[in-house]
Curated annotation (Swiss-Prot):
Entry keyword Ribosomal protein: no
Name of protein: Eukaryotic translation initiation factor 4E
PANTHER family associated with the record: EUKARYOTIC TRANSLATION INITIATION FACTOR 4E, EUKARYOTIC TRANSLATION INITIATION FACTOR 4E RELATED
GO MF annotations, alphabetized: DNA-binding transcription factor binding; enzyme binding; eukaryotic initiation factor 4G binding; mRNA cap binding; RNA 7-methylguanosine cap binding; translation initiation factor activity
Positions of post-translational Phosphoserine modification: 209
Subcellular location: Cytoplasm, P-body; Cytoplasm; Cytoplasm, Stress granule; Nucleus
Stretches the record annotates as EIF4EBP1/2/3 binding: 37-40, 73-77, 132-139
Free-text description of this protein's post-translational modifications in UniProt: Phosphorylation increases the ability of the protein to bind to mRNA caps and to form the eIF4F complex. Phosphorylation also enhances its mRNA transport function. Phosphorylation at Ser-209 is not essential for protein synthesis.
Role played: Acts in the cytoplasm to initiate and regulate protein synthesis and is required in the nucleus for export of a subset of mRNAs from the nucleus to the cytoplasm which promotes processes such as RNA capping, processing and splicing. Component of the protein complex eIF4F, which is involved in the recognition of the mRNA cap, ATP-dependent unwinding of 5'-terminal secondary structure and recruitment of mRNA to the ribosome.
Record-stated family: Belongs to the eukaryotic initiation factor 4E family.
Length: 217
Protein backbone atom coordinates (compact mmCIF):
# COMPACT_ATOMS: atom_id res chain seq x y z
CA UNK A 1 0.00 0.00 0.00
CA UNK A 2 1.42 3.29 -1.01
CA UNK A 3 2.07 5.75 1.75
CA UNK A 4 1.63 9.44 1.35
CA UNK A 5 4.36 11.51 2.83
CA UNK A 6 2.92 14.34 4.92
CA UNK A 7 3.54 17.78 3.50
CA UNK A 8 6.39 19.46 5.25
CA UNK A 9 5.76 23.02 6.25
CA UNK A 10 8.65 25.20 5.07
CA UNK A 11 10.78 26.34 7.96
CA UNK A 12 10.72 30.13 8.34
CA UNK A 13 13.93 31.67 7.20
CA UNK A 14 15.73 33.03 10.30
CA UNK A 15 18.03 35.63 8.73
CA UNK A 16 15.43 38.45 8.63
CA UNK A 17 14.79 38.00 12.34
CA UNK A 18 18.53 38.07 12.93
CA UNK A 19 18.81 41.19 10.83
CA UNK A 20 16.00 42.83 12.77
CA UNK A 21 17.66 41.86 16.01
CA UNK A 22 20.95 43.23 14.80
CA UNK A 23 19.33 46.47 13.71
CA UNK A 24 17.57 46.72 17.06
CA UNK A 25 20.84 46.17 18.89
CA UNK A 26 22.54 48.79 16.78
CA UNK A 27 19.81 51.26 17.60
CA UNK A 28 20.18 50.67 21.32
CA UNK A 29 23.96 50.83 21.13
CA UNK A 30 24.10 54.00 19.05
CA UNK A 31 27.00 55.97 20.60
CA UNK A 32 25.04 59.20 20.22
CA UNK A 33 22.67 57.86 22.89
CA UNK A 34 25.23 57.49 25.63
CA UNK A 35 28.44 59.33 24.78
CA UNK A 36 28.50 62.86 26.19
CA UNK A 37 29.96 65.72 24.19
CA UNK A 38 33.02 67.14 25.97
CA UNK A 39 33.64 70.86 26.32
CA UNK A 40 37.07 72.33 25.78
CA UNK A 41 37.18 73.51 29.40
CA UNK A 42 35.75 72.41 32.73
CA UNK A 43 33.47 75.09 34.21
CA UNK A 44 32.23 75.91 37.70
CA UNK A 45 28.91 77.59 38.49
CA UNK A 46 28.79 79.74 41.63
CA UNK A 47 25.92 81.36 43.52
CA UNK A 48 26.14 84.45 45.72
CA UNK A 49 23.42 85.45 48.18
CA UNK A 50 23.83 88.76 49.95
CA UNK A 51 23.52 87.97 53.66
CA UNK A 52 24.88 90.98 55.53
CA UNK A 53 25.50 88.87 58.64
CA UNK A 54 28.18 86.90 56.75
CA UNK A 55 31.43 87.80 55.02
CA UNK A 56 31.46 88.19 51.23
CA UNK A 57 33.30 84.90 50.80
CA UNK A 58 30.92 83.09 53.14
CA UNK A 59 28.04 84.21 50.91
CA UNK A 60 29.67 82.67 47.83
CA UNK A 61 28.79 79.03 47.20
CA UNK A 62 29.96 76.60 44.54
CA UNK A 63 26.92 74.92 42.97
CA UNK A 64 28.46 72.43 40.55
CA UNK A 65 31.13 71.75 37.94
CA UNK A 66 30.67 70.33 34.46
CA UNK A 67 32.69 69.60 31.33
CA UNK A 68 30.13 68.25 28.84
CA UNK A 69 27.30 69.80 26.84
CA UNK A 70 24.76 67.46 28.42
CA UNK A 71 25.84 68.23 31.99
CA UNK A 72 25.63 71.95 31.28
CA UNK A 73 22.01 71.68 30.14
CA UNK A 74 21.11 69.37 33.03
CA UNK A 75 22.45 71.98 35.45
CA UNK A 76 20.96 74.99 33.65
CA UNK A 77 17.50 73.40 33.52
CA UNK A 78 17.67 72.49 37.22
CA UNK A 79 18.45 75.92 38.70
CA UNK A 80 16.35 79.07 39.02
CA UNK A 81 16.38 81.54 36.15
CA UNK A 82 18.26 84.74 36.90
CA UNK A 83 15.03 86.73 36.62
CA UNK A 84 13.60 84.74 39.54
CA UNK A 85 16.49 85.41 41.93
CA UNK A 86 16.11 87.79 44.86
CA UNK A 87 17.82 91.19 44.48
CA UNK A 88 21.38 90.98 45.77
CA UNK A 89 22.02 87.53 44.28
CA UNK A 90 24.57 86.60 41.61
CA UNK A 91 25.36 83.67 39.37
CA UNK A 92 28.95 83.29 38.18
CA UNK A 93 30.32 80.83 35.63
CA UNK A 94 34.12 80.57 35.62
CA UNK A 95 36.71 78.19 34.28
CA UNK A 96 37.55 75.57 36.87
CA UNK A 97 40.35 76.83 39.08
CA UNK A 98 39.37 80.52 38.80
CA UNK A 99 37.27 81.98 41.61
CA UNK A 100 34.73 84.73 40.76
CA UNK A 101 36.58 87.53 42.57
CA UNK A 102 38.94 90.32 41.56
CA UNK A 103 41.69 88.99 43.80
CA UNK A 104 42.08 85.69 41.94
CA UNK A 105 45.45 85.41 40.19
CA UNK A 106 43.74 85.11 36.78
CA UNK A 107 41.45 88.09 37.39
CA UNK A 108 43.51 90.70 39.22
CA UNK A 109 45.04 92.23 36.05
CA UNK A 110 41.84 91.84 34.08
CA UNK A 111 38.54 93.56 33.54
CA UNK A 112 35.00 93.07 32.26
CA UNK A 113 32.69 93.84 29.38
CA UNK A 114 29.61 95.17 31.14
CA UNK A 115 25.97 95.03 30.04
CA UNK A 116 23.60 97.11 32.17
CA UNK A 117 19.86 96.45 32.06
CA UNK A 118 17.01 98.57 33.35
CA UNK A 119 14.31 97.11 35.58
CA UNK A 120 11.93 96.53 32.67
CA UNK A 121 14.53 94.37 30.90
CA UNK A 122 14.55 91.77 33.68
CA UNK A 123 11.54 90.06 32.14
CA UNK A 124 12.34 90.73 28.49
CA UNK A 125 16.12 90.36 28.17
CA UNK A 126 17.91 89.19 31.33
CA UNK A 127 17.47 85.42 30.97
CA UNK A 128 18.04 85.50 27.21
CA UNK A 129 21.22 87.58 27.52
CA UNK A 130 22.58 85.45 30.38
CA UNK A 131 21.99 82.17 28.53
CA UNK A 132 23.68 83.56 25.41
CA UNK A 133 26.59 84.65 27.60
CA UNK A 134 26.92 81.13 29.01
CA UNK A 135 26.82 79.61 25.53
CA UNK A 136 29.53 82.03 24.36
CA UNK A 137 31.74 80.86 27.21
CA UNK A 138 31.32 77.09 27.03
CA UNK A 139 31.32 77.17 23.21
CA UNK A 140 34.66 79.03 23.13
CA UNK A 141 33.06 81.59 20.81
CA UNK A 142 35.87 84.15 20.84
CA UNK A 143 38.17 82.39 18.37
CA UNK A 144 41.88 82.74 19.21
CA UNK A 145 41.05 84.86 22.25
CA UNK A 146 38.83 82.42 24.16
CA UNK A 147 41.78 81.63 26.43
CA UNK A 148 41.62 85.24 27.65
CA UNK A 149 38.11 84.70 28.99
CA UNK A 150 37.93 83.85 32.71
CA UNK A 151 34.17 83.72 33.23
CA UNK A 152 30.96 85.72 33.48
CA UNK A 153 28.74 87.16 36.20
CA UNK A 154 25.09 88.19 36.39
CA UNK A 155 24.16 90.58 39.21
CA UNK A 156 20.46 90.81 40.08
CA UNK A 157 19.83 94.19 41.71
CA UNK A 158 16.76 96.24 42.62
CA UNK A 159 17.91 99.28 40.63
CA UNK A 160 18.86 97.29 37.53
CA UNK A 161 20.68 94.09 36.62
CA UNK A 162 24.16 93.62 35.17
CA UNK A 163 25.87 90.95 33.09
CA UNK A 164 29.61 90.93 32.51
CA UNK A 165 32.24 88.80 30.80
CA UNK A 166 35.57 88.85 32.65
CA UNK A 167 38.90 88.63 30.84
CA UNK A 168 42.33 87.98 32.29
CA UNK A 169 44.40 90.92 30.98
CA UNK A 170 42.93 94.41 30.58
CA UNK A 171 45.97 95.64 28.61
CA UNK A 172 45.55 93.06 25.85
CA UNK A 173 43.74 95.38 23.46
CA UNK A 174 43.38 92.90 20.58
CA UNK A 175 41.84 90.21 22.77
CA UNK A 176 39.60 92.56 24.73
CA UNK A 177 38.18 94.37 21.69
CA UNK A 178 37.62 91.15 19.72
CA UNK A 179 35.78 89.58 22.65
CA UNK A 180 33.65 92.72 23.02
CA UNK A 181 32.69 92.83 19.34
CA UNK A 182 31.77 89.14 19.23
CA UNK A 183 29.83 89.40 22.48
CA UNK A 184 27.83 92.42 21.31
CA UNK A 185 26.99 90.63 18.06
CA UNK A 186 25.94 87.43 19.84
CA UNK A 187 23.59 89.39 22.11
CA UNK A 188 22.05 91.00 19.04
CA UNK A 189 22.63 94.53 20.32
CA UNK A 190 22.05 97.29 17.74
CA UNK A 191 25.02 99.47 16.69
CA UNK A 192 23.65 102.48 18.57
CA UNK A 193 23.99 100.59 21.88
CA UNK A 194 27.53 101.06 23.20
CA UNK A 195 29.01 98.68 25.76
CA UNK A 196 32.13 99.41 27.78
CA UNK A 197 35.10 97.51 29.16
CA UNK A 198 36.39 98.40 32.62
CA UNK A 199 39.46 97.15 34.45
CA UNK A 200 38.86 95.58 37.85
CA UNK A 201 41.50 97.90 39.31
CA UNK A 202 39.56 100.97 38.12
CA UNK A 203 36.30 99.52 39.42
CA UNK A 204 37.85 98.84 42.83
CA UNK A 205 39.21 102.38 43.18
CA UNK A 206 36.38 104.37 41.59
CA UNK A 207 35.46 107.55 43.44
CA UNK A 208 31.92 107.94 42.09
CA UNK A 209 29.14 105.60 41.03
CA UNK A 210 30.60 104.93 37.58
CA UNK A 211 33.90 103.53 36.32
CA UNK A 212 35.69 104.86 33.26
CA UNK A 213 35.74 102.62 30.20
CA UNK A 214 39.07 101.40 28.85
CA UNK A 215 37.43 100.30 25.59
CA UNK A 216 33.99 100.58 23.99
CA UNK A 217 32.30 98.76 21.10
Amino acid sequence: MATVEPETTPTPNPPPAEEEKTESNQEVANPEHYIKHPLQNRWALWFFKNDKSKTWQANLRLISKFDTVEDFWALYNHIQLSSNLMPGCDYSLFKDGIEPMWEDEKNKRGGRWLITLNKQQRRSDLDRFWLETLLCLIGESFDDYSDDVCGAVVNVRAKGDKIAIWTTECENRDAVTHIGRVYKERLGLPPKIVIGYQSHADTATKSGSTTKNRFVV
